[in-house]
Amino acid sequence: MDTVADIAINWLENTNIDGFRHDATKHIPDEFWKTITRRAKAKVNPSRQQNIFQIGESFGSYEFIKSYVNNGMLDSQFNFELFFTLRRIFVEKESDFADLKMALEKSLSIYGYNNLMGNIMDSHDQVRMMAYLDGDLDFSDNGTERA
C-alpha cells in the first residue's frame, strides 16, 4: 500500500497533474484511499495553490457511493444513478425531465451541494450514449442492446 501511495505522490509532485481518476474503487481497500489522500494533503497540497482532486468510479447505491466521498477517501465519485436516468430519458424513452429533476434533487440531497460529483453522459463501462443516439444501436423491448 505504501509503495503505491509513494508512486502516486511522485506523479503528483513531478508532473503537476491536478489529481487522479480512480477505477473500480470498491475493489481496493478503503485504507488505501485514506492513505493516499492523507499523504497527498500533507505533502503535495501545501506546495500548491489548489488541492489535489480525486474522483472514483464504483457502481452501487447512492449510500454506497457517498461512503467514499469527503470522509478521508475521495473528493468525488461518478454519479451513475444520474447517468442511468439520462439514458432512460434520451435512449429508452421511458422517462421525462420530471424524473431528471427528481434525480438531480435526490443527488443533491444525498451528496450535498458542497460535493462536486462526476455527472457523466458516457462511460467505458457502459455502451456509449452516442451509439444509441446516432442510431448504431437500438434498445430492444427488454432493455438489452442489439446491433
Task: State each model region's role.
Residues R128:
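Active-site neighborhood of divalent metal-dependent phosphoester/pyrophosphate hydrolases
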Residues M1-T3:
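Active-site mouth loops of central-metabolism enzymes
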Residues I7-I9, E13-I120, D134-L137, D141-R146:
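Active-site-proximal helices and loops of the catalytic beta/alpha 8
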